[in-house]
Amino acid sequence: GMGIGINLPPCIKNGEYCNPWTGSIILGGACCGTCTDYECH
C-alpha cells in the first residue's frame, strides 16, 4: 500500500445498526453492503 497513515475501521456486518445520514454510529464506519431502514443489508 501507499502507507498514508489512515486506518479505516472494518465494514459493519449485515443486520447491525447503521444511520443512513452518517453511515453508522461508529465514526468512519460503513456497511459492508448498503444501509437501509437503519440496518446494514
Swiss-Prot record:
It comes from Hastula hectica. GO terms for cellular component: extracellular region. The keyword Ribonucleoprotein does not apply. Keywords: Disulfide bond, Knottin, Secreted, Toxin. The presence of a 'disulfide through disulfide knot' structurally defines this protein as a knottin. This is Augerpeptide hhe6.1. The keyword Cytoplasm does not apply. Disulfide bonds join 11-32, 18-35, 31-40. Expressed by the venom duct. GO terms for molecular function: toxin activity. It is found in: Secreted.
